[in-house]
């Protein structure tokens, strides 16, 4: 370019100062103006979003919850982890960590938490019987001089999804829903990482059981990282 700047997918790089001119959207590491923690030989940053290192840590830190939820709902822990991993790598940027809970609190049907579940999806999972049904009475705040005040059902569900352990249970319940819905026409569904992750990504409103499902890029990414996340879980 005539400006001397180089466009690298998501940001412009200034070779004269060896720095990007804007912050890394993932805000990963101590310096947000460098590439891949300033270590391009060890790390890559294909999207400018959540780094592999950060996503790996999320799976490791929540391994106990993932394995426990998978056992409770009868889903493969590797598939559950791979689906969460795909959400973290492909669909999360730094803004999600800060604004999803806020906009969800005010009624926007946004994706929240480690499994990036929409509030409406969580309500559907409850309706189908995979998680307890929440109501406005299940949450609230103690306000000085006023006492305990309940919020709305939306607020309760949003706050619930911010809890990683509960969010993972919703994610496991959603995968179990798809297994149950598809098993008669596609008996191998419970072992298909790419298909289950695709269904999770597209959602129940855009999919219907059939005997010849095809994965999307999200599902393919989850399948490619299946063995990797099992290692992160300590299962290999």
Residue ranges and their predicted role:
Residues 1-52:
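Short turn/helix-capping motifs enriched in Asx and small/polar residues
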Residues 51-236:
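Catalytic glycan-binding domains that act on GlcNAc-containing polysaccharides
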